[in-house]
Amino acid sequence: MWILIYLFIIWSSLRTWVTAVDSTTTVGDDLNETVSASVWPTMSPQMTVAFRSQRDVMGNLTIDQLPYVGLNLRRVLLNNETSMVNEGNNTRLLTLFKSMLSSEANAFVLDLEQYNNDLRVVDTTLLFSDVLTALQSFIFSTQNNLYANIIVLLLNISAPELDSTEYRHQNQTLNTTYILDKNLGNSFIYKPTDLQSDRAKNNTWNIYGKSSIDGWPTLGSVLYEQKKRLVIGELTDFFNETTAPYIFPHDVFHYEQGNSTLDCPSTVEGLTDLSSIHWRFLDSLFNSVDIKEYISCGLSPIISNSAYVNNVTQLADIIHEGSVWSWDSDQPSVTQSTSKSGSSSGTLEAYNCVLLYYFANNETVTWRVGNCYNSNIGLCRYENMAFRWLVRSNKATYFDFDSYQGSKCPDQYSFNIPRSPLEQRSFIAYMRNSSFSDTQIWIDLNSISVSNCWVSGGPYASCPYEKVISRRNFVTMMVPASVCSFALLCIVVYLSVLRVPIYDNRKNWRRVINKISKSELEGVPS
């Protein structure tokens, strides 16, 4: 019995310790996880952290202003020049498509044609339902705060060669709602009715602020509150609101092919005017150099490089260059710790804060991890104005620049960060007009609470993915359990070693009992 109690005490102590250790696990532990298929090059742990941190920084941007990097599937994969298509290997095509979804690409142009009251991918034997099933599988596997992101699916519909009466009849009998419901599920789709509802609730914004007329919801609202993952739009004029209520019409999107008619803005006024245009896509040929320039000009590139048609994985480098518009090539490091350490000179080090490096000679910027205890100037933004910046000349550590005691930013300004390529472009314009030389500037991004979890909101912002227990809280939690376990263990040892007096004098006690028994009368009293 005592052995069982002792084992229970040990088990309870170990369980408490394991629970505490598990709760201190950082986001870095999931860096080796992947939802990618083996066909497409998987993102490295560093790339995963960089891409996720960008997504989180853009959480308060509206979904129509996000920088998307996309693929024209007919040009790069689903066409009759591709060996897999010629072989009729639909399984490999779908596997490759799913692995593309796991890459940094988050917009896709898909060419469809009507086929026996159904939709089929042009130049293949794939049905639209097959693509939707693969898309559903990917969404299910990434439906969490770590991996979730918005996907844009743009449809080019080829009309059948029929007269107007037959065309109108087939268009009306094609039930796209049924196809989407059966193979994908409408709960993941952000629909036109959802946009109407958000605008009615005043939950939409444009560049000037809240707008119930032409505003769109933020990325954070769509992903985390509404749990939506997919926006479907049509680039042709095949459907209408009645035949395809889940699909946004073509006039919602600014979609161009070849060369862009939009100028690359260099002033605040030009940036504001460009931001008033929703969903800016450019379908063209790109390389790893010019795609970054198009991204910085506020366009979302759709890659149509047919030269890679038989080795589509070569596009991974181009997609990578377009997707990461913020961090430097070797950043952020995923091996740093949030603990304070002292260097040989006796100074504190904590490489968990982000510096924006501005290079005046070529007017470029990049983000790098820096020591939070170093003194640098910081970046401030004016209220909710997306393109109005101020760099403070007084230097401070990251902890002192924006602390509980107050911010180094002046009134009506707040410690901030460029949240998009356009905002970063406006910052470059500010630095150029202010004649700054090469400069390192604190921005509102750090991983102080949890390693590899980069968050905004000052030095005391918490990681949304992980509950953090500090060493002090860990000791506070463990001490009572340890003391109680030790006390119970002492009692068990004491009772197992020492005998109670009645047990030690058992023979004497039996002699006394026998003597008393002899003096008792036997029989029944008369």
UniProtKB/Swiss-Prot annotation:
GO biological process: one example: cellular response to hydrostatic pressure
Claim: Repeat is one of the keywords in the record: no
Q: Which residues cross the membrane?
A: 478-498
Instruction: Please provide, in alphabetical order, the Gene Ontology terms of the cellular component aspect for this entry.
Output: endoplasmic reticulum membrane
Question: Which N-terminal residues, if any, form the signal peptide?
Answer: 1-20
Would you list which residues are glycosylated?
Answer: N32, N60, N80, N89, N156, N171, N175, N202, N240, N259, N311, N362, N433
InterPro entries under this entry? Answer: Telomere_Capping_Maintenance (IPR051008)
The record's section on Pfam families has:
TIM-barrel_MTC6
What family is this? Belongs to the MTC6 family.
- The protein's name is Maintenance of telomere capping protein 6
